[in-house]
């Protein structure tokens, strides 16, 4: 049963990617990046802004804040 559940990180990133929700990413060194997540994998996130893409390694990310409220799961879970 646990194998067919998606982890929270992937569910969050996939939701903001599909919905093209603008995000603010804070890195562990305090740098703030803003844009739309266009792709991600186990190690990095591709962030797009003003026609430019930035590859950001997940180990450098502290926080990802969506620019609008999101609802990942529906129901009583």
From Swiss-Prot:
Single GO term (MF): RNA binding
Q: Which GO terms describe its cellular component?
A: cytosol
User: What family does the database annotate?
Assistant: Belongs to the Hfq family.
* Subunit: Homohexamer.
Provide this UniProt record's keywords sorted from A to Z: RNA-binding, Stress response
Q: Tell me the InterPro entries matching this sequence.
A: Hfq, LSM_dom_sf, Sm
Q: Name one Pfam family in it.
A: Hfq
Please state every residue range assigned to the domain named Sm: 10-70
Name assigned to this protein: RNA-binding protein Hfq
- Coiled-coil intervals in this record? none
Question: What is its biological role?
Answer: RNA chaperone that binds small regulatory RNA (sRNAs) and mRNAs to facilitate mRNA translational regulation in response to envelope stress, environmental stress and changes in metabolite concentrations. Also binds with high specificity to tRNAs.
Matches recorded under SUPFAM superfamilies: Sm-like ribonucleoproteins
Q: Which GO terms describe its biological process?
A: regulation of DNA-templated transcription; regulation of RNA stability; regulation of translation, ncRNA-mediated
